[in-house]
Curated annotation (Swiss-Prot):
Cofactor: Mg(2+)
Protein name according to UniProt: Phosphopantetheine adenylyltransferase
Family (UniProt): Belongs to the bacterial CoaD family.
Keyword annotations of the record: ATP-binding, Coenzyme A biosynthesis, Cytoplasm, Magnesium, Nucleotide-binding, Nucleotidyltransferase, Transferase
The gene coding this protein: coaD
């Protein structure tokens, strides 16, 4: 891998990976040569699908992306900043839809910087029409749809 490549990781529980994530990924690819989508644990969330299921679903969602620029990894036991260091990524991609997300991301960014001083967190803001998309809402909608069946 070239030393000049701008490498980023885009971590998330991705349960599920949705159009909002895809939108942020597209924006990240305008800035970076390689983006690792890292399926990881979020201690603040209860996931509904296994790592393997999420990896398969995510890989199917990104079939139209250049495989040399987007790769999917599973992280079960390392901190995000440690994964970035192992992969040679100098950037962590995150997104914030509102002030609550922003405050949360601010704390995460500071923690990641303390663990890995070489990493910078890049917040990519969604376009206006994508602001309301989130995984929890999608899971709740699916749950309600299943109740109606």
């Amino acid at each position: 891998m070239s030393m000049n490549k701008k490498i980023a990781i885009f971590p998330g529980s991705f349960d599920p990976f949705h159009n909002g994530h895809k939108h942020i990924l597209n924006k990240a690819l305008a800035l970076f040569d390689l983006v690792y989508l890292v399926i990881t644990i979020n201690p603040d969330k209860i996931t509904k699908t296994s790592f393997d299921q999420r990896k398969t679903l995510l890989e199917n969602e990104i079939l139209d992306f250049d495989k040399s620029r987007v790769q999917v990894l599973v992280n079960k036991d390392s901190l995000t900043a440690e994964i970035a260091k192992k992969l040679g990524a100098k950037f962590i991609i995150r997104s914030a839809r509102n002030d609550i997300d922003y405050q949360y991301e601010l704390v995460l960014a500071a923690g990641n910087k303390k663990i890995n001083n070489e990493v910078e967190t890049i917040l990519i803001f969604p376009d206006y029409d994508k602001i309301e998309i989130n995984s929890t809402l999608i899971r709740h909608q699916k749950f309600i749809e299943n109740l109606k069946k």
